[in-house]
């Protein structure tokens, strides 16, 4: 997404969000600003945090995911989960203020795409603020472990160019005060700790007695429909796709939307549902914060300014579909 770019200042907050309430109301929908805390599939009702209960004939869930933070880490004075995205904007302001006082030690935990982009864009933030910081990426087993060696090599070169220290084979085990301890026993200074260790759906579905996958996501069939409750559907990060595991990337959520729309309408009238067929190849572009990106498209891997220009164009074009 565009979150790391907002952290660095490449994108403004208003450029990476759209007004869901306005969109819903303008199309004749009701908008309720509240949190669903439990689903009652027997009564076909949603229980909201504010106490209200909302009945449904069909329901679609896109409740997203969050970053699980161990209690031994959450005690740190300045831990920043990379989701929800508002956390990044708050961290940006706090880092800019802190840089006026001293050189910072910033640690990013997580060697996936999010960790890579956060670490790289932190360097841009520090540079533009005319400050100084030691930035360390603790990548777990290895950086971008599930990717081709060509992608990893370009990412590693990019981090070296940005003077980001990469540590592999270790994880952040504990954090307190102004330091973190790694699984190797090593302790490192840390003023800000960004947690990018993967995402996990909320416990909503398990708490409601609805079948869920190993990570707690709503277990759905190829129609994006609950395997036990045919009136319940879902998409994005909050589902577990029974036919095969799906990476938690935005392209799947975007492609699931028209399928969900069709199937919700068809379910209301007893029509035949249409399957979601996930693509196996999709464009991946990692924003390196310096106007370049590492790009993978099928077997093609490249990096540079053209890569970032492509990513930026696609991201902004998508957002403008809903902002206009």
Predicted stretch roles:
Residues 1-58, 148-165:
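N-terminal Rossmann-like dinucleotide/flavin-binding domain of flavoprotein oxidoreductases
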